[in-house]
């Protein structure tokens, strides 16, 4: 991590190094862009007495961001941090990706999900309704396959910014066959799902 502490680096105040074991290719960076992270070449991890950084800093960018004249924010990751998170599920990678999304969208997120476990969320829009797919990735097979058992997680609190003409007062849970009551305020629908075993689909109309 280089330069001043940016909002994207929130939560990493106690360190200047993040783990990485993926692919990264050198590239030329525009003069107006900011480089928040640079690559540290690999070094031995065993035996312990040799585990130290031979080259603690390079000019190889790992995370680049820019703000255009119209206010649009752009983040480019030469380092495949997203693929590393999908593969190894390291919390540091997940937190960094979360910060990147929040900064790029200026904290104007269309959905906020909170609760235990690892939940994959996909929000879709169709005429007259919004559909949220929730997949529970928390399992006994987190580090190996095949999946041994479902581990239900919950409660899951969900807050969705409603599209025009969507009331969002009574979300329908297609998998569990329930219809629940949501709290609708200032264009947001907030509700809670008690438990998700493997998959749930929420429909807002």
Model-found features: residue ranges?
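A conserved amphipathic helix/loop scaffold
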Residues: 1-205
């Amino acid at each position: 991590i280089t330069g001043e502490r940016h909002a994207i680096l929130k939560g990493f105040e106690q360190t200047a190094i993040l783990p990485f074991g993926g692919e990264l290719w050198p590239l030329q960076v525009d003069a107006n862009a900011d480089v928040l992270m640079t690559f540290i070449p690999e070094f031995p991890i065993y035996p312990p007495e040799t585990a130290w950084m031979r080259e603690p800093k390079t000019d190889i960018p790992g995370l680049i961001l820019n703000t255009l004249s119209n206010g649009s924010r752009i983040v480019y990751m030469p380092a495949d941090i997203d693929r590393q998170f999908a593969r190894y599920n390291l919390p540091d990678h997940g937190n960094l990706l979360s910060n990147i999304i929040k900064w790029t969208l200026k904290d104007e997120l269309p959905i906020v999900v909170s609760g235990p476990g690892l939940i994959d969320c996909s929000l879709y829009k169709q005429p007259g309704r919004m559909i949220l797919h929730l997949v529970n990735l928390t399992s006994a097979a987190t580090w190996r396959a095949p999946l041994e058992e479902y581990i239900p997680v919950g409660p899951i609190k969900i807050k969705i910014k409603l599209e025009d003409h969507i009331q969002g007062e009574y979300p329908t849970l297609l998998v569990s066959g329930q219809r629940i009551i949501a709290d609708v305020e200032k264009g947001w629908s907030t509700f809670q799902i008690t438990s998700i075993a493997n998959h749930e689909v929420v429909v807002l109309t």
